[in-house]
Protein backbone atom coordinates (compact mmCIF):
# COMPACT_ATOMS: atom_id res chain seq x y z
CA UNK A 1 0.00 0.00 0.00
CA UNK A 2 1.43 3.38 -1.09
CA UNK A 3 1.17 5.16 2.26
CA UNK A 4 3.50 7.84 0.88
CA UNK A 5 0.36 9.29 -0.73
CA UNK A 6 -0.47 10.65 2.73
CA UNK A 7 1.76 13.66 2.21
CA UNK A 8 0.21 16.10 4.69
CA UNK A 9 2.64 16.76 7.58
CA UNK A 10 1.32 15.25 10.81
CA UNK A 11 1.19 18.68 12.48
CA UNK A 12 -0.92 20.08 9.67
CA UNK A 13 -3.19 17.03 9.76
CA UNK A 14 -3.83 17.30 13.50
CA UNK A 15 -4.13 21.06 13.76
CA UNK A 16 -6.37 21.53 10.71
CA UNK A 17 -8.60 18.49 11.21
CA UNK A 18 -12.20 19.26 12.08
CA UNK A 19 -15.62 17.66 11.99
CA UNK A 20 -17.15 17.77 8.51
CA UNK A 21 -20.90 17.25 8.15
CA UNK A 22 -21.59 18.68 4.69
CA UNK A 23 -20.37 16.45 1.89
CA UNK A 24 -20.32 16.44 -1.87
CA UNK A 25 -21.87 13.39 -3.47
CA UNK A 26 -18.72 12.57 -5.49
CA UNK A 27 -17.64 8.95 -4.98
CA UNK A 28 -14.40 8.19 -3.18
CA UNK A 29 -11.98 5.99 -5.15
CA UNK A 30 -11.79 2.50 -3.67
CA UNK A 31 -7.99 2.74 -3.50
CA UNK A 32 -8.37 5.77 -1.22
CA UNK A 33 -10.80 3.88 1.01
CA UNK A 34 -8.28 1.01 1.13
CA UNK A 35 -5.51 3.39 2.20
CA UNK A 36 -7.72 5.00 4.85
CA UNK A 37 -8.60 1.63 6.38
CA UNK A 38 -4.97 0.48 6.23
CA UNK A 39 -4.05 3.62 8.19
CA UNK A 40 -6.77 2.85 10.73
CA UNK A 41 -5.49 -0.62 11.57
CA UNK A 42 -1.95 0.70 12.14
CA UNK A 43 -3.14 2.50 15.28
CA UNK A 44 -2.14 1.15 18.71
CA UNK A 45 -4.46 -1.55 20.02
CA UNK A 46 -4.64 -3.34 23.35
CA UNK A 47 -2.39 -6.39 23.56
CA UNK A 48 -2.16 -6.43 19.77
CA UNK A 49 -5.39 -8.45 19.79
CA UNK A 50 -6.59 -6.50 16.75
CA UNK A 51 -10.27 -6.74 17.62
CA UNK A 52 -11.30 -3.73 15.51
CA UNK A 53 -13.51 -4.45 12.51
CA UNK A 54 -14.71 -2.04 9.82
CA UNK A 55 -17.82 -2.31 7.68
CA UNK A 56 -17.59 0.03 4.68
CA UNK A 57 -20.65 1.18 2.75
CA UNK A 58 -20.32 2.52 -0.80
CA UNK A 59 -23.55 1.24 -2.38
CA UNK A 60 -25.83 4.28 -2.74
CA UNK A 61 -29.00 2.25 -2.20
CA UNK A 62 -27.63 0.70 0.98
CA UNK A 63 -26.48 4.09 2.28
CA UNK A 64 -29.89 5.56 1.51
CA UNK A 65 -31.54 2.81 3.53
CA UNK A 66 -29.11 3.35 6.41
CA UNK A 67 -29.76 7.10 6.26
CA UNK A 68 -33.35 6.50 7.32
CA UNK A 69 -32.19 4.62 10.41
CA UNK A 70 -29.55 7.23 11.21
CA UNK A 71 -32.11 10.04 10.98
CA UNK A 72 -34.41 8.21 13.39
CA UNK A 73 -31.52 7.49 15.78
CA UNK A 74 -30.32 11.09 15.80
CA UNK A 75 -33.72 12.49 16.68
CA UNK A 76 -34.39 9.75 19.24
CA UNK A 77 -31.26 10.84 21.08
CA UNK A 78 -32.22 14.52 20.91
CA UNK A 79 -35.70 13.77 22.25
CA UNK A 80 -34.24 11.71 25.09
CA UNK A 81 -31.60 14.28 26.06
CA UNK A 82 -33.21 17.62 25.17
CA UNK A 83 -36.87 17.01 24.41
CA UNK A 84 -36.40 18.10 20.78
CA UNK A 85 -38.39 16.35 18.06
CA UNK A 86 -37.84 18.69 15.09
CA UNK A 87 -35.31 21.28 13.93
CA UNK A 88 -37.52 24.17 15.00
CA UNK A 89 -37.12 22.96 18.61
CA UNK A 90 -33.35 23.57 18.55
CA UNK A 91 -32.55 26.95 20.19
CA UNK A 92 -30.75 29.47 17.93
CA UNK A 93 -27.66 29.43 20.15
CA UNK A 94 -27.21 25.66 19.66
CA UNK A 95 -25.48 26.05 16.29
CA UNK A 96 -23.58 22.77 16.52
CA UNK A 97 -26.83 20.85 16.92
CA UNK A 98 -28.27 22.67 13.93
CA UNK A 99 -25.34 21.46 11.83
CA UNK A 100 -25.61 17.95 13.21
CA UNK A 101 -29.31 17.88 12.37
CA UNK A 102 -28.38 18.63 8.76
CA UNK A 103 -26.17 15.53 8.73
CA UNK A 104 -29.14 13.55 10.04
CA UNK A 105 -31.01 14.66 6.92
CA UNK A 106 -28.10 14.16 4.54
CA UNK A 107 -26.56 10.90 5.76
CA UNK A 108 -28.56 9.10 3.08
CA UNK A 109 -26.61 10.97 0.38
CA UNK A 110 -22.99 10.67 1.58
CA UNK A 111 -20.68 8.67 -0.73
CA UNK A 112 -19.19 6.41 1.94
CA UNK A 113 -19.96 5.35 5.51
CA UNK A 114 -17.68 3.32 7.77
CA UNK A 115 -18.90 1.47 10.86
CA UNK A 116 -16.15 0.96 13.43
CA UNK A 117 -16.87 -2.16 15.45
CA UNK A 118 -15.05 -4.70 17.63
CA UNK A 119 -15.24 -8.45 18.01
CA UNK A 120 -15.30 -9.88 21.57
CA UNK A 121 -14.46 -8.64 24.10
CA UNK A 122 -15.67 -5.65 22.09
CA UNK A 123 -13.98 -2.90 24.07
CA UNK A 124 -13.51 0.54 22.55
CA UNK A 125 -9.89 1.03 23.65
CA UNK A 126 -8.62 -0.42 20.37
CA UNK A 127 -11.28 1.15 18.16
CA UNK A 128 -10.92 4.77 19.28
CA UNK A 129 -7.25 5.15 18.18
CA UNK A 130 -8.05 3.39 14.90
CA UNK A 131 -10.93 5.76 14.25
CA UNK A 132 -8.70 8.79 14.75
CA UNK A 133 -6.09 7.31 12.40
CA UNK A 134 -8.84 6.72 9.85
CA UNK A 135 -10.02 10.31 10.02
CA UNK A 136 -6.50 11.77 9.86
CA UNK A 137 -5.71 9.67 6.79
CA UNK A 138 -8.96 10.79 5.17
CA UNK A 139 -8.13 14.42 5.96
CA UNK A 140 -4.71 14.01 4.34
CA UNK A 141 -6.50 12.91 1.15
CA UNK A 142 -8.87 15.89 1.23
CA UNK A 143 -11.75 13.77 2.55
CA UNK A 144 -13.86 15.01 5.45
CA UNK A 145 -15.30 12.93 8.26
CA UNK A 146 -16.96 13.04 11.66
CA UNK A 147 -17.42 10.31 14.30
CA UNK A 148 -21.07 9.70 15.16
CA UNK A 149 -23.08 7.10 17.06
CA UNK A 150 -26.52 5.52 16.95
CA UNK A 151 -29.31 5.02 19.52
CA UNK A 152 -30.62 1.85 21.19
CA UNK A 153 -33.97 2.40 19.48
CA UNK A 154 -32.53 1.36 16.12
CA UNK A 155 -29.82 -1.12 17.05
CA UNK A 156 -31.75 -4.34 16.37
CA UNK A 157 -32.78 -3.10 12.93
CA UNK A 158 -29.28 -1.80 12.27
CA UNK A 159 -27.75 -5.18 13.07
CA UNK A 160 -30.32 -7.00 10.97
CA UNK A 161 -29.79 -4.65 8.02
CA UNK A 162 -26.07 -5.47 7.86
CA UNK A 163 -26.05 -8.99 9.37
CA UNK A 164 -23.86 -7.79 12.25
CA UNK A 165 -23.61 -10.54 14.90
CA UNK A 166 -24.92 -9.80 18.38
CA UNK A 167 -21.51 -10.30 19.97
CA UNK A 168 -19.88 -7.65 17.76
CA UNK A 169 -19.81 -4.26 19.49
CA UNK A 170 -20.70 -1.18 17.46
CA UNK A 171 -18.75 1.96 18.38
CA UNK A 172 -18.81 4.60 15.64
CA UNK A 173 -20.50 5.52 12.39
CA UNK A 174 -18.12 7.63 10.29
CA UNK A 175 -19.42 9.31 7.13
CA UNK A 176 -16.71 10.13 4.59
CA UNK A 177 -16.84 12.56 1.69
CA UNK A 178 -15.26 15.57 0.05
CA UNK A 179 -16.27 18.71 1.98
CA UNK A 180 -19.00 20.75 0.32
CA UNK A 181 -17.80 24.01 1.84
CA UNK A 182 -14.43 25.39 2.95
CA UNK A 183 -13.63 25.04 6.64
CA UNK A 184 -11.27 26.98 8.85
CA UNK A 185 -9.36 25.43 11.74
CA UNK A 186 -11.29 24.23 14.77
CA UNK A 187 -11.75 26.41 17.85
CA UNK A 188 -10.79 24.83 21.16
CA UNK A 189 -10.38 26.01 24.72
CA UNK A 190 -6.76 26.76 25.67
CA UNK A 191 -5.00 23.67 27.02
CA UNK A 192 -4.05 25.73 30.07
CA UNK A 193 -7.74 25.44 31.02
CA UNK A 194 -8.00 21.70 30.46
CA UNK A 195 -4.59 20.37 31.55
CA UNK A 196 -3.02 20.00 35.01
CA UNK A 197 0.55 19.31 36.09
CA UNK A 198 1.42 16.60 38.64
CA UNK A 199 -1.81 17.08 40.61
CA UNK A 200 -5.45 17.62 39.67
CA UNK A 201 -6.17 21.32 39.47
CA UNK A 202 -2.49 22.35 39.51
CA UNK A 203 -1.74 24.79 36.66
CA UNK A 204 0.58 24.06 33.77
CA UNK A 205 3.45 26.50 33.05
CA UNK A 206 1.93 27.89 29.86
CA UNK A 207 -0.99 30.10 28.98
Q: Which ranges hold each PLM region?
A:
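C-terminal helix-cap and adjacent tail motif
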Residues: 2-6, 97-99, 172-207
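Generic N-terminal amphipathic, Lys/Arg-enriched alpha-helix
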Residues: 9-26
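Short alpha-helical scaffolding segments that buttress acidic/His motifs in well-ordered protein cores
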Residues: 14, 36-40, 174
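Conserved, non-catalytic sequence blocks in retroelement Pol enzymes and Pol-derived host proteins
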Residues: 29
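Small-aliphatic-rich amphipathic alpha-helix that forms the alpha element of a beta-alpha
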Residues: 35-40, 112-161
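Glycine-rich phosphate/pyrophosphate-binding beta-alpha loops
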Residues: 41-49
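Glycine/small-residue-rich phosphate/adenosyl-binding loop
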Residues: 50-126
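A glycine-rich helix N-cap at a beta->alpha junction
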Residues: 75-86, 162-187
